[in-house]
Amino acid sequence: MSKKAHILIIYTGGTIGMVKDYKLNVLKAFDFDNLKKNIPELNLINCKIDTISFDEPLDSSNIHPNDWVKIAAIIEVNYDNFDGFVVLHGSDTMSYTASAISFMFENLSKPIIFTGSQLPIGDLRTDAKENLITSIQIASSQIDGKPIISEVCLYFEYKLYRANRTTKINAEHFEAFTSPNYPALAESGVHLKFNHDLLLKSVNQDKLIVRKELNNNIAILKIFPGITQNVVESFLNAKDLKGIILETYGSGNAPTSEWFLKLLQNALLKGIHIVDVTQCVGGSVILGQYETSIQLQELGLISGFDITTESAVAKMMYLLGLELSDQQFRELFMTSLRGELN
């Protein structure tokens, strides 16, 4: 008989960790030290649960790469003592944080499941309990004593996604996230069904490496009709800028104005990495498919293929932190490192 899985819940902040004080009509922090007392359904899950919380829980709008490092450090120091991890996080920036954690952890062999909620855990119609309970169940799921999941995932409203494939699509619906270019890894209904063929496999026994050096001197430039030379020029001349996520139209298309292409060329000559990512929710960048992307290809922009903007941001910070050569950066960005690209 296999031993009970031991799961660590890490509360960073967010709606899921709030309860309503009906006397004062305000939200207050949930007592995670008495988690099973407040959510007795957790006693039905065949696992042991411990909790840890940020000393000062964060609204996810205030999340910073330093906080990603903090989350990574908590998991790293507890890695050998637990079988899986559930990270509770505000939904607004969850895809950014979860994507970053996926890149920071090399040779991961245990589940790290991010979840949150649209309503506080104490609300009458809350989605928090189901998201939390099922995330713990997923993190504790094993076959022959080994975890079913060995990657960073995001669970929300009955679906488990690869974290670095997700994006938030709705501020009000319970179904707040989607994975536009990769199917769900598992679905929760009457039964919890894993799509085993879609999961990342832990193929080696190499020692866990946690990369905590992130360089956030990057920016997102979203192309729109009528964007001016002054705006682009001032943007590209920002001090200490190391990388740009260029959000283009469709399959990677952008204006062919001489001034625009010249500014991009100047940025590249200064050693700034430019990654072409589509503005579309789904689909992929295919540089050279149309005339309006041929010149971007000739300039040497990096294709983001079907990566999400959130994942591109996290991946760029991670790769910049490795201090690679330009060619190494280019090759690794265009390579699927954690299942973020098709």
Question: What are these language model-derived features?
Answer:
Residues M1-V77:
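ATP/NTP phosphate-donor binding region
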Residues K3-K4, I10-G14, F32-N43, R162-S251, ...:
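Accessory alpha-helical/coil subdomains and C-terminal extensions
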Residues T12-G14, G90-S91, S117-P120, Y249-G250, ...:
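Short, ordered loop/turn segments at secondary-structure junctions
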Residues M18-V19, T93-A98, N131-L132, N253-P255:
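Short glycine/serine/threonine-rich phosphate/pyrophosphate-binding segments
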Residues F82-M94, K239-G252:
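Short acidic, glycine-rich surface-loop motifs adjacent to enzyme active sites
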Residues L88-K110, T256-L263, T292:
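Short Gly/Thr/Asp-enriched flexible loops that form oxyanion-binding sites at enzyme active sites
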Residues F114-G189:
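Internal gly/pro-rich beta-alpha loop/helix module
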Residues T248-N342:
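C-terminal non-catalytic interaction/assembly regions of soluble proteins
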